[in-house]
């Protein structure tokens, strides 16, 4: 894991993926698996998923209504993208422990984290960014440098996250290239699913809360 952190700290041009999933609009989904809903005021929400503890998942209200997410920002992936990457890397799981740890690795999370649940929800697409120097979500690759349009606020957040990711007591292999770092030593590629951030204050709607093992068992029955 620490080797992954050191590797991720240096982002190289050859590490750029040109196949990142994009978030554009309900009228122009990136693929047929991408799920959207449109509210009465024309706000468009796309389905995303975030791994967390079951306790934190339960802190989100059990409601079928939309609400404003005030719990802070969430790092997320797109459900179908997570499923595709997981199935390619681990076609079969022996038990819940193996399943959970493989998800932790795939998402670039520390081995000591106790996440065991997936929160699947819809989020306002306009409140989602890609955690890269150019943070738009509508294309399929990231840039290595900030565009002129990058705000001072975003640049400051980005640089602070660089410091906390690589130079703190709790480091993360943040790629800054729009995908997670899969740190499993036997993985054919360290390029994980595309990652995004849902900002605090976003309009969201909970789809479901599911433990990792149940998620995998359901995934294993899909064709």
Label the predicted regions.
Residues 104-223:
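Conserved NAD+-utilizing ADP-ribose enzyme module
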Residues 72, 98, 113-116:
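Short, well-structured alpha-helical interface segments that form or flank functional binding sites
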Residues 1-77:
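ADP-ribose/NAD+-binding catalytic cleft of ART/PARP-like enzymes
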Residues 77-80, 122-124:
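Short His-Asn-centered micro-motif
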Residues 53, 81-84, 126-129:
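Solvent-exposed loop/turn segments at secondary-structure junctions
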Residues 60, 89-92, 133-136:
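Surface-exposed beta-strand edges and their flanking turn/coil or helix-capping segments
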Residues 98-104:
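A Trp-anchored, charged/polar loop motif used as the substrate-binding/catalytic surface
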């Amino acid at each position: 894991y620490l080797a992954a952190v050191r590797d991720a700290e240096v982002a190289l041009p050859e590490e750029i993926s040109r196949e990142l999933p994009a978030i554009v609009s309900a009228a122009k989904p990136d693929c047929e698996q991408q799920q959207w809903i449109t509210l009465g005021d024309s706000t468009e929400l796309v389905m995303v998923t975030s791994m967390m503890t079951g306790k934190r998942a339960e802190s989100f209200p059990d409601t079928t209504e939309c609400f404003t997410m005030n719990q802070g920002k969430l790092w997320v992936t797109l459900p179908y993208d997570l499923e595709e990457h997981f199935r390619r890397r681990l076609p079969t799981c022996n038990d819940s422990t193996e399943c959970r740890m493989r998800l932790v690795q795939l998402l670039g999370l520390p081995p000591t984290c106790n996440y065991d649940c997936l929160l699947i929800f819809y989020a306002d697409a306009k409140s989602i960014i890609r955690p890269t120097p150019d943070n738009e979500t509508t294309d399929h690759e990231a840039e290595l440098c900030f565009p002129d349009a990058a705000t001072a606020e975003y640049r400051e957040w980005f640089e602070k996250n660089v410091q906390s990711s690589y130079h703190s007591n709790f480091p993360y292999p943040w790629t800054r290239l729009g995908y997670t770092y899969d740190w499993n030593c036997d993985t054919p590629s360290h390029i994980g699913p595309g990652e995004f951030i849902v900002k605090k204050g976003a309009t969201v709607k909970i789809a479901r809360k599911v433990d990792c093992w149940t998620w995998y068992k359901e995934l294993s029955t899909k064709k």
